[in-house]
């Protein structure tokens, strides 16, 4: 349960104000189809984070515990710096196609998550916890905890959130995770 909660919290902190949250907002305001958008986010996230977890678990099996600890610690510190860099929403409207809101969302979210900090965090968490199901479910839950309210409340919530403070809180959380990992803090397993 602890691994699940760490995975969920890590992704929630990284996803607040992220480009995929902005993408959810854009898709919702353009398509006005919340249920297919939410289902599309779920499918894309499951696929993307499963891929990331598989890669992370594979990489974790190749590294010694000491090298893995340092790699993960530095990765979390780099994520802390990365989260401070503002994401920019695309200025144009999403292309409309015959795929419908669901397929457009699946495709857009899967591609937007490629190389994103939450995907990299999912890889790092899988390398650490080595439980694919827990990592995939925890990271997906974290994404959905951020994206579902964004879709359901759309513009109202986004206008009132102080994005700078959210970014600072996420950077602080990633920094703490990085330092604790480097120091061998027990809940992270090192």
Where are these regions (language model features)?
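Membrane helix-loop-helix hairpins that form the core translocation module of multi-pass transporters
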Residues: 32-101, 149-172, 176-179
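Hydrophobic/aromatic residues within the transmembrane alpha-helices of Major Facilitator Superfamily
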Residues: 12, 16, 46-47, 81, ...
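Short loop/beta submotifs within extracellular cysteine-rich repeat domains
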Residues: 17-21, 84-86, 115-120, 130, ...
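Juxtamembrane/interfacial segments around transmembrane helices
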Residues: 93-100, 121-128, 157, 189-190
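Selected transmembrane alpha-helices and immediately adjacent juxtamembrane segments
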Residues: 94-119
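Juxtamembrane transmembrane-helix termini in multi-pass membrane transport proteins
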Residues: 1-61, 121-142, 149
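Short hydrophobic "helix-edge" motifs at membrane interfaces and signal-peptide entry regions
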Residues: 7-9, 103-107, 152
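Juxtamembrane boundary at the C-terminal end of a transmembrane helix
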Residues: 179-190
């Amino acid at each position: 349960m602890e691994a699940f909660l760490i995975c969920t919290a890590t992704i929630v902190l990284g996803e607040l104000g992220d480009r995929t949250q902005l993408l959810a907002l854009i898709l919702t305001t353009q398509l006005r189809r919340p249920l297919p958008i939410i289902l599309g986010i779920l499918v894309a996230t499951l696929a993307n984070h499963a891929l990331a977890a598989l890669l992370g678990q594979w990489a974790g099996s190749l590294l010694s515990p000491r090298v893995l600890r340092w790699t993960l610690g530095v990765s979390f510190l780099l994520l802390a710096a990365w989260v401070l860099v503002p994401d920019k929403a695309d200025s144009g409207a999403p292309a409309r196609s015959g795929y419908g809101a669901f397929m457009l969302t699946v495709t857009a979210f899967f591609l937007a998550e490629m190389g994103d900090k939450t995907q990299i965090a999912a890889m790092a968490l899988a390398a650490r916890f080595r439980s694919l199901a827990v990592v995939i479910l925890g990271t997906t839950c974290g994404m959905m905890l951020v994206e579902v309210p964004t879709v359901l409340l759309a513009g109202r919530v986004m206008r009132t959130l102080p994005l700078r403070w959210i970014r600072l809180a996420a950077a602080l959380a990633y920094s703490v995770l990085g330092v604790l990992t480097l120091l061998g803090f027990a809940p992270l397993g090192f």
